[in-house]
Amino acid sequence: MTIENTQNINIDTLSRRYSTQIQRRKTRSVMVGNIGIGSDYPVAVQSMINEDTLDIEASTSAIRRLHEIGCEIVRLTVPSLSHAKAVGEIKRRLEQNYLPVPLVADVHHNGMKIALEVAKHVDKVRINPGLFVFSNPDPSRTEFSNSEISAIKEKIINNFEPIVNTLKAQNKALRIGVNHGSLAERMLFQYGDTPLGMVESAMEFVRICDSLDFHNIVISMKASRPPVMLAAYRLMADAMDKEGFNYPLHLGVTEAGDGDYGRIKSTVGIGTLLTEGLGDTIRVSLTEAPEKEIPVAYSILQTVGLRKTMVEYISCPSCGRTLFNLEEVVAKVRDATSHLTGLDIAVMGCIVNGPGEMADADYGYVGKGKGIIALYRGREEIRKVPEDEGVSALVELIKSDGKWIDP
């Protein structure tokens, strides 16, 4: 294809691979409290408290802290009937003293009775297919007979059907949450420790829900290694397409760790799938306070262009042409403007590449000469000011345009 030909091609005619706009996979809408999950809604951010649910006061406070900083859905662990009943009091206190925060109950080992109780108090129940009907693995086993497989499937249906029916009756949601590290022994024998085994674990439960005409379902396929997680979600989307299902996906890299590496792992896994159009809600899992997960989640969503909830800063890496201490100035600009939302602000070290590279920014701060800063609105240079007045002059420019709000 020649350069002349490419000039006449509309971006809509190009493959999705070359589009600069993410085209989300079309999924059905599932309501979790007042938050919608699905392609008709923004990608939702969620997290999980690490308090013992029996500590009602601490759990209520932890949920509120997360919600106040932007966590839209909060999960809590429910390992027993006592915990399930405690959730009812937690929800009551939230509604009475704060807001009705969308809550998800995490139910694992042989959790039918727990799920039936906690479904009264939460907006969504999460079950793990690998642990739902659980028995300790037999190290001497070499295979599963057809009769054993049939018996296990029947037990799953008998235990799962009451949960589906109660969620359906209450118009609540279900997450079928597969973890790579906890596949059922039967699945490991049949498919190995593979993404395909994860997909089949989920699809078994999806088909049961479909047979009961229950469709308030969200699906997750989490693994601690991004390549496994990526393969599992892609396979899951393909499997659903093949069988005519369009349930939303909850993305996450489980056990991502802490610090920079934990954030990088989560970003690689979650961000990659989002750019492919997969994912309707996300959770960044860090071995840190849950509150630290929320800014990372919103940063991922903003980076890929799906939600804009903060200032987008554009700044060059600095070089020998830089006319001021770029790192120091970026920090000052951020301190002065980080409370704003929806703006793009560029800080560039010199005029060689600065104006061109910041062309899409709302405002620009560019080194013009020794001790001189040029301020831009879009592509237009507005004024030159001494360097020591640059940040305050930028703030005044934003104010004059009516785009400033006080912190």
UniProtKB/Swiss-Prot annotation:
<dbReference type="InterPro" id="IPR016425">
    <property type="entry name" value="IspG_bac"/>
</dbReference>
<dbReference type="GO" id="GO:0005506">
    <property type="term" value="F:iron ion binding"/>
</dbReference>
<keyword id="KW-0408">Iron</keyword>
<comment type="similarity">
    <text>Belongs to the IspG family.</text>
</comment>
<feature type="binding site">
    <location>
        <position position="319"/>
    </location>
    <ligand>
        <name>[4Fe-4S] cluster</name>
    </ligand>
</feature>
<feature type="binding site">
    <location>
        <position position="357"/>
    </location>
    <ligand>
        <name>[4Fe-4S] cluster</name>
    </ligand>
</feature>
<protein>
    <recommendedName>
        <fullName>4-hydroxy-3-methylbut-2-en-1-yl diphosphate synthase (ferredoxin)</fullName>
        <ecNumber>1.17.7.1</ecNumber>
    </recommendedName>
</protein>
<dbReference type="GO" id="GO:0016114">
    <property type="term" value="P:terpenoid biosynthetic process"/>
</dbReference>
<dbReference type="GO" id="GO:0019288">
    <property type="term" value="P:isopentenyl diphosphate biosynthetic process, methylerythritol 4-phosphate pathway"/>
</dbReference>
<dbReference type="Pfam" id="PF04551">
    <property type="entry name" value="GcpE"/>
</dbReference>
<dbReference type="InterPro" id="IPR045854">
    <property type="entry name" value="NO2/SO3_Rdtase_4Fe4S_sf"/>
</dbReference>
<feature type="binding site">
    <location>
        <position position="350"/>
    </location>
    <ligand>
        <name>[4Fe-4S] cluster</name>
    </ligand>
</feature>
<keyword id="KW-0414">Isoprene biosynthesis</keyword>
<comment type="pathway">
    <text>Isoprenoid biosynthesis; isopentenyl diphosphate biosynthesis via DXP pathway; isopentenyl diphosphate from 1-deoxy-D-xylulose 5-phosphate: step 5/6.</text>
</comment>
<keyword id="KW-0004">4Fe-4S</keyword>
<comment type="function">
    <text>Converts 2C-methyl-D-erythritol 2,4-cyclodiphosphate (ME-2,4cPP) into 1-hydroxy-2-methyl-2-(E)-butenyl 4-diphosphate.</text>
</comment>
<feature type="binding site">
    <location>
        <position position="316"/>
    </location>
    <ligand>
        <name>[4Fe-4S] cluster</name>
    </ligand>
</feature>
<keyword id="KW-0411">Iron-sulfur</keyword>
<dbReference type="InterPro" id="IPR004588">
    <property type="entry name" value="IspG_bac-typ"/>
</dbReference>
<dbReference type="GO" id="GO:0046429">
    <property type="term" value="F:4-hydroxy-3-methylbut-2-en-1-yl diphosphate synthase activity (ferredoxin)"/>
</dbReference>
<dbReference type="InterPro" id="IPR011005">
    <property type="entry name" value="Dihydropteroate_synth-like_sf"/>
</dbReference>
<dbReference type="GO" id="GO:0051539">
    <property type="term" value="F:4 iron, 4 sulfur cluster binding"/>
</dbReference>
<keyword id="KW-0560">Oxidoreductase</keyword>
<keyword id="KW-0479">Metal-binding</keyword>
